[in-house]
Swiss-Prot record:
Mg(2+) binds at D463, D465, D467. One of its GO terms (cellular component) is DNA-directed RNA polymerase complex. Its cofactor is Mg(2+); Zn(2+). It comes from Chlamydia pneumoniae. It catalyses: RNA(n) + a ribonucleoside 5'-triphosphate = RNA(n+1) + diphosphate. The RNAP catalytic core consists of 2 alpha, 1 beta, 1 beta' and 1 omega subunit. When a sigma factor is associated with the core the holoenzyme is formed, which can initiate transcription. GO terms for biological process: DNA-templated transcription. Its EC number is 2.7.7.6. One of its GO terms (molecular function) is magnesium ion binding. This is DNA-directed RNA polymerase subunit beta'. PANTHER family: DNA-DIRECTED RNA POLYMERASE (PTHR19376), DNA-DIRECTED RNA POLYMERASE SUBUNIT BETA (PTHR19376:SF54).
Length: 1393
């Protein structure tokens, strides 16, 4: 267990150090002779009169040691001078009482007892070794049936079960001595002892080789793995049956006296007492030669008592304690949040800490925090005492403490001295990312609240409505140094998740800066004056200070001489030799801007401030940026105070056009209602159309209101507009509710209530409207409570799966790469290429397109912002970069594949815990978003547009589109995978454009992907102009359109079975709807060329839920609607849908309504119907290869006969199953899919997370392979092994001339991947504790303590950051040098002597 140690942990003694930890099954001899200090024979705990432990009982002092330090039980020996003496009267050793936390005892069992973990935990270890089922084992263990151990000369077989009647029959027939059959633990013990594992292993391997059935092979491989575990370890199978039970030290299961003479005891004592009582009773019964039936019952009861002790409730009913509560067994002590692992080993209480309410400290510098004097006195007490003793002010610790309590003046002086340069750590719970703990220089303050700098609030997610924070004091020099160098607030001004600044002025500061930098509103020419010209900035500032400034509201504030200047006045000033037109406010602002950034001459909303801070960091470094941030904070607060912006009711201006727009909307809703009444549209469509109308109204009014408040009036700026436009407070959605209308509201289930709230908050809501509002508000609060827990659990799983991913080397030298491009939606670019490639390593040289002489980036370069921008500007669409997904480091990842550390813009350092950073980056916004749901107040936010409008002039070209001319004269799209391209007018023919686009020889100005049923308003090849409507999208239905003329015939549309006629209650009209059915019917509409139905022209499958729009025998023309499938009511999008989606992706779950995807490239065809499923065939015309897909008739197809599809393309509606992408398209495509899908969820919420974080999680999900053919290796069929282990084993086998194993990549969800980690300590502390430990013990697994969690649990320094091996090597080298110096010094002295 203890290996040669290379760790330097400082605090632990050298004997306490170890490099690895091995777990195994303890033998009876180990329990009795090595662990135990004596046998417990009595169930008594303490004497009721003396309250002293009973001799031989569960708290016996003779076995466990004395209850008082250096004092034996009878009092003969007291004091330390008798150390180590064993009292001759009471037998107690004189030692420290803390040995009662270490010394164990044992209970000698009357009969062998089966350990419930090895029998009940799936897969059953005992069952697998013996080849018996769990139910058979249970009947034997609990004394219901006999099992044959040795059949002798009888016709019985080994391991055959016999009930009482059969047993008596066999005894009568063959005699009692002719065979051996037993019950209970004894029988299992004998069977396990007699099992020849080597021959069993051979036999299983042989059977595995011969078996062809996949299922049987999987079963055999699982059993083989367990047997191999026993063979390769020093464990004996019979050790799974206990003859002795270890007893936990008494101080770990204490008995505590309460008031009133009662005692509180650990549940374990009750459980042990039951075992001892039953064991003693059984021993007595066995001595008395009691009837077999009573003995058997007693043995079963003992087995149950031991089961309850190890795992209460695993077998039968749990043992209850007082108040009908199940007793906590040893398993419960380890499991779950309050178990030993998570409660005591991974989360400990910390001394030298305190907590208090926080308040804002605008006077603080960025690296400071205000610490209440009383708190500091308590926290730094030991330091103060030492300093007081060193000064000679006091001589004992007691007198120093008294002096501190008195609050003597010298104490305060000493405290001031001590805290200089001694940082403290501040933490706010929940600590969702590493910025939740930062270090500050403490500043002593009066009062009892901690003060924090306004700019660190965002990182802590803190506000001052009663939030509390904890303070921790780093004690050792190393800890102080680490806090100073790595954790100080100025070192943490960027988010590790995206590299964006987190320390940005907000609220009042933003408002003050925006006000200062606002566009000129005072033009002297309009007031009969001239534009003032100043020779430099100082002159402007002097004018400002001398004359005061002219206020927006109070007009001029000039001095007696009439001098003065308006803060927003248009002036001219000479700066750096140039005359610039600006405002005095901007001159004032530029006084604090570093000169390298140039003169900032534009308004300053919060987004621009953020960009300025980033720019500042890149140009002038951290120190100057931090100074700039402090100056921004001060200036912002001063200007906000001076501007005194406040909001009045009149500032909320209701748009004049409101009543007109509302009247219009009501008219449109009435038309839709009439269409419904006439039976033209369905209830679902009516609902959807109504919602679309109100959404549009909502947007119109919102825009009108924003324009209204942005107009300047007599007092120049509307305060409401200032607040929103600056980004200080509020947004357009909230403004809309204040002054336009509240709009559509959502029900708690997400469905939108179709009657909107047309009032706004300025007008006031009616009672009904208020009642509707409460829906949304309540949903928000309920969501917050429920989803926070979900998000926290997701973060925990992510941390667990990625915790051991650290930077282990500079460069792994891989040639692998991934390709990335900009992300767009239609013609809109959501994420430019430069943002995606910044900070990544280029995998191959990047040249200017068409100019090989101009190198933009060299292979191996880590791209900075300048290079990234140059590549983007050069028009390069895709670029090959290195990624953690393709990194070949044997453990962890390399710095080059990871790229820059986003928190500081430098290459990531060695030992950096990138896995945990990744998990926090993904988990933190999830929690934030769930907490923020209610800010929308349940306002319906539907994101879909009913029309496509072009933003450029050019020629419209249809690409990959099948269209048919509709009845209105417009083209209707018949296939799904096509697009409309707008290309520059170069005077070519349409065919030339199409050819150039297909070969990517020309760039499109815009691309609009279109789907089935889109109505294109412009013909192919027609010129279009900016702002022109080119297509209409059907939002409410998926249409099924006819593309050939002919006559209709219904096929399998049988009323009452596959269809039903529904009478519309309002109109009385009958609608034919296809319903779900279980028969052999396959509803479709066939089209024949004439009324006699002689020749079939085409068939159209009709999915369930569709409404048929044509009648049988009717003549139809191309473009006519045959049927329509309502899209259902639109639900609001919210991260509440998003978080489960992220969990579904990272857990690699199969989505509920999964889509079918094409397995090969080819053309779609249909081949009839079989067992309620449509046979869809994809045929590759080049190779003639065909792939069949059986698709349920209820599923909606998104491809049609004759469509070309590519491998991996969706054939039906729904979400894709990730495992299928892996199987069909391979690992690279799956990685791309998972990264993009997770990003999609966060992007919808406007959350920015760098791809590299998601890539690390995906890498962890794909780190295993599944063995398909073990070859000559020791690997097993169907086993999931680490890629590293797989390649290593294959290399060894090939060197020995054997056949290597074959494997396929396997995708594991994060929970499964966490449990499959190499470290059993880490896995056990995550989930399934008992199963993980049982598994590890059977195979005698060794934990090499390579990850973080296992080292924290063992109390070692973590192998990351400053604890990384490189750092440790430096430390050891320095220590060795010191030793050599000492040795040299000693030698020299000896020579002198």
């Amino acid at each position: 267990m203890f290996g040669e140690n290379s760790r330097d942990i400082g605090v632990l003694s050298k004997e306490g150090l170890f490099d690895k930890l091995e777990i195994g099954i303890a033998s009876d001899i180990t329990i009795r002779d090595k662990w135990s200090c004596g046998e417990i024979k009595k169930p008594e705990t303490i004497n009721y009169r003396t309250f002293k432990p009973e001799k031989g009982g569960l708290f016996c002092e003779k076995i466990f040691g004395p209850t008082k330090d250096w004092e034996c039980c009878c009092g003969k020996y007291k004091k330390i001078k008798h150390k180590g003496i064993v009292c001759d009267r009471c037998g107690v050793e004189v030692t420290l009482s803390k040995v009662r936390r270490e010394r164990m005892a044992h209970i000698e069992l009357a009969v062998p007892i089966v350990h419930i973990w090895f029998f009940k935990t799936t897969p059953s270890r005992i069952g697998n070794v013996l080849g018996m089922t769990a139910s058979d084992l249970e009947r034997v263990i609990y004394y219901e049936e006999y099992v044959v151990i040795d059949p002798g000369k009888t016709d019985l077989t080994k391991k055959q079960l016999l009930n009482d009647a059969q047993y008596r029959e066999v005894v009568e027939k063959w005699g009692k001595d002719a065979f051996v059959a037993k019950m209970g633990g004894e029988a299992i013990y004998d069977l396990l002892k007699s099992e020849d594992l080597q021959s069993l292993l051979k036999d299983l391997k042989e059977r595995l080789r011969k078996t062809k059935s996949q299922q049987a092979r999987m079963k055999l491989a699982k059993r083989l793995k367990i047997i191999e575990g026993f063979v390769s370890s020093s464990n004996h199978p019979e050790w799974m049956v206990l003859k002795n039970i270890p007893v936990v030290p008494p101080d770990l299961r204490p008995l505590v006296p309460l008031d009133g003479g009662r005692f509180a005891t650990s549940d374990l004592n009750d459980l042990y007492r039951r075992v001892i009582n039953r064991n003693n009773r059984l021993k007595a019964i066995l001595r008395l030669k009691t009837p077999e039936v009573i003995v058997r019952n007693e043995k079963r009861m003992l087995q149950e008592a031991v089961d309850a002790l190890f795992d209460n409730g695993r077998h039968g009913h749990p043992v209850m304690g007082a108040g009908n509560r199940p007793l906590k067994s040893l398993s419960e002590m380890l499991k779950g949040k309050n178990g030993r692992f998570r409660q005591n080993l991974l989360g400990k209480r910390v001394d030298y800490s305190g907590r208090s309410v926080i308040i804002v400290g605008p006077e603080l510098k960025f690296n400071q925090c205000g610490l209440p004097k009383e708190m500091a006195l308590e926290l730094f007490e030991p330091f103060i005492i030492k300093r007081l003793k060193d000064q000679g002010s006091v001589y004992t610790i007691r007198s120093a403490k008294k002096m501190i309590q008195r609050g003597a003046p010298e104490v305060w002086d000493v405290l001031e001295e001590i805290i200089k340069g001694h940082p403290v750590l501040l933490n706010r719970a929940p600590t969702l990312h590493r910025l939740g703990i930062q270090a500050f220089e403490p500043v002593l303050i009066e009062g009892k609240a901690i003060r924090i700098h306004p700019l660190v609030c965002a990182a802590f997610n803190a506000d001052f409505d009663g939030d509390q924070m904890a303070v921790h004091v780093p004690l050792s020099v190393e800890a102080q140094l680490e806090a100073k160098v790595l954790m100080m607030a100025p070192d943490n001004i960027f988010l590790p998740s995206s590299g964006k600044p987190v320390a940005i002025p907000s609220k009042d500061m933003t408002l003050g800066l925006y006000y200062l930098m606002a566009d000129p509103t005072y033009f002297p020419e309009e007031h009969g004056g001239k534009t003032k010209i100043f020779k430099d900035e100082i002159e402007v500032l002097r004018a400002l200070n001398n004359g005061g400034f002219i206020d927006d509201v109070f007009g001029d504030r000039r001095d007696e001489t009439g001098r003065g200047i308006h803060i927003h006045e248009k002036i001219k000033v000479r700066i750096d030799g140039q005359i610039i037109e600006t405002t005095p406010g901007r001159v004032l602002f530029n006084r604090i801007v570093p000169k390298e950034l140039g003169f900032q001459n534009y308004s300053m909303p919060s987004k621009r401030i953020s960009e300025l801070i980033l720019q500042c960091y890149k140009k002038v470094g951290l120190e100057a940026t931090v100074r700039f941030l402090d100056d921004l904070k001060d200036l912002g607060f001063i200007q906000a105070t001076k501007a005194a912006i406040s909001m009045g009711l009149k500032d909320v201006r209701i748009p004049d056009i409101k009543s007109h727009i509302l009247k219009d909307a009501y008219d449109k809703v009435a038309i839709v209602k009439k269409q419904y009444d006439d039976g033209i549209i369905t209830e679902g469509e009516r609902h959807s159309k109504t919602i679309s109308i109100w959404t549009e109204v909502s947007e119109q009014l919102s825009d009108a209101l924003y324009v209204e408040i942005s107009k300047q009036t007599r007092s120049k700026h509307n305060p409401l507009f200032l607040m929103i436009d600056s980004g200080a407070r509020g947004n357009k959605s909230q403004l809309k509710q204040l002054g336009a209308l509240r709009g559509l509201m959502a029900k708690p289930n997400g469905a939108i209530i179709e009657s909107p709230i047309t009032s706004n908050f300025r007008e006031g809501l009616t009672v009904l409207e208020y009642s509707i509002s409460s829906h949304g508000a309540r949903k928000g609060l309920a969501d917050t409570a429920l989803k926070t827990a979900d998000s926290g659990y997701l973060t925990r799983r992510l941390v667990d799966v990625a915790q051991d991913v650290i930077i282990t080397e500079k460069d792994c030298g891989t040639l692998n790469h991934i390709e990335i491009s900009a992300i767009g939606q239609g013609s809109e670019e959501l994420l430019p290429l430069k943002d995606r490639i910044y900070g990544r390593t280029v995998a191959e040289d990047v040249y200017q397109p068409g100019d090989k002489s101009r190198l933009l980036a060299q292979s191996g370069d880590v791209l900075n912002s300048v290079q990234a921008e140059a590549i983007d500007d050069a028009g390069i669409e895709t670029i090959k970069i290195r990624s953690t997904l393709t990194c070949e480091s044997p453990r962890g990842v390399c710095a080059k594949c990871y790229g820059l550390n986003l928190a500081n813009g430098r290459l990531i350092g060695m030992g950096e815990a990138v896995g945990i950073i990744a998990a926090q980056s993904i988990g933190e916004p999830g929690t934030q978003l769930t907490m923020r749901t209610f800010h929308l107040g349940g306002i319906a936010a539907t994101s879909s547009t009913p029309e496509i409008i072009t933003n450029s002039d050019g020629i419209l070209v249809y690409m990959d589109l099948r269209v048919v001319l509709g009845q209105e004269g417009h083209n209707l799209v018949l296939n799904k995978k096509g697009a409309l391209h707008v290309v520059g007018d170069e005077g070519r023919t349409l065919n030339e454009y199409k050819k150039l686009l297909s070969t990517k020889s020309i760039e499109s100005l815009e691309v609009f992907p279109v789907e089935l049923g889109v109505k294109i308003l412009v013909a192919d090849g027609t010129p279009v102009s900016q702002g022109q409507r080119i297509a209409e999208v059907e939002l409410h239905n998926i249409p099924i359109i006819c593309d050939k003329p002919g006559f209709i015939k219904y096929e399998d549309l049988v009323e009452g079975i596959s269809t039903e006629k529904v009478v519309n209650k309002n109109t009385g009209l009958v609608e034919l709807i296809v319903k779900q059915h279980r028969g052999e019917l396959h509803p479709q509409i066939a089209i024949y060329d004439d009324a006699d139905l002689s020749e079939l022209v085409g068939t159209y499958a009709i999915p369930s839920g569709a409404i048929i729009s044509v009648e049988e025998g009717q003549r139809v023309d191309p473009g006519m609607l045959l049927a329509r499938l309502p899209r259902g009511a639109i639900k609001t999008k919210d991260i509440t849908g998003g978080l489960p989606r992220v969990a579904e992706l990272v857990e690699a779950r199969k989505p509920e309504d999964a889509a079918d995807i094409a397995k090969i490239d080819g053309v779609v065809d249909f081949k009839g119907i079989q067992k309620n499923k449509r046979i869809l065939v994809v045929c590759d015309e080049m190779t003639g290869m065909e792939e069949e897909h059986l698709i349920p008739l209820t599923k909606h197809l998104i491809v049609q006969r004759g469509d070309s599809v590519i491998k991996g393309q969706q054939l039906t509606d729904g979400l894709v199953v990730p495992h299928e992408i892996l199987e069909i398209c391979g690992v690279r495509e799956l990685q791309k899919y998972l990264v993009n899908e997770v990003q999609e969820v966060y992007r919808l919420q406007g959350v920015d997370i760098n791809d590299k974080h998601i890539e690390i999680i995906v890498r962890q999900m794909l780190q295993k392979v599944r063995i398909t053919d073990p070859g000559d290796t020791t690997l097993l069929f169907g086993e999931d092994v680490n890629k590293k282990e797989f390649y290593e084993e294959n290399r060894r086998t090939e060197e020995d001339g054997g056949k290597p194993a074959q494997a396929v990549p396997v995708l594991l969800g994060i929970t499964k991947a966490s449990l499959g980690t190499e470290s059993f300590i880490s896995a056990a502390s995550f989930q399934d504790t008992t199963r993980v430990l049982t598994d590890a013990a059977c195979c005698s697994k060794t934990d090499y303590l390579l990850g973080f969690k296992e080292n924290v649990i063992m109390g070692h320094m973590i192998p990351g950051g400053t604890g990384f091996e490189t750092h440790k090597r430096i430390k050891q080298y320095l220590e060795k040098e010191q030793e050599d110096l000492v040795f040299d010094f000693v030698s020299e002295t000896e020579c002198v002597c």
